[in-house]
């Protein structure tokens, strides 16, 4: 079975320090880890200080339906309130090198 890849870049404001963002992301990651269909997640931080997206989350889900159910839940919606601008999208792998 193939998994689907979530790529979610975050536009973290300059006045928000990394620790504050990481704390919120950690709570959301713990919740997602408990949801059906979640496979794994990795959070990446930009090396360049001028990057538009300071953090990018890359996660795997068993299906788009599992992901949608997780993000539409009232628990996740409450956690996501106040999250910096982000642009989540699901992808499927089409080539591997």
Question: Residue ranges of each PLM-predicted region?
Answer:
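A generic signature of intrinsically disordered, low-complexity regions enriched in glycine/proline
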Residues: 12, 19-23, 61, 96
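Short amphipathic alpha-helical segments
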Residues: 15-43, 75-83
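Short, surface-exposed, polar/charged, turn-prone segments marking secondary-structure boundaries
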Residues: 33-38, 59-61, 67-72, 82-89, ...
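Glycine-rich beta-strand-turn "strand-cap" elements at beta-sheet edges
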Residues: 1-4, 42-53, 79-97
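Short, well-ordered beta-strand segments in beta-rich or mixed alpha/beta enzyme
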Residues: 3-11, 42-73
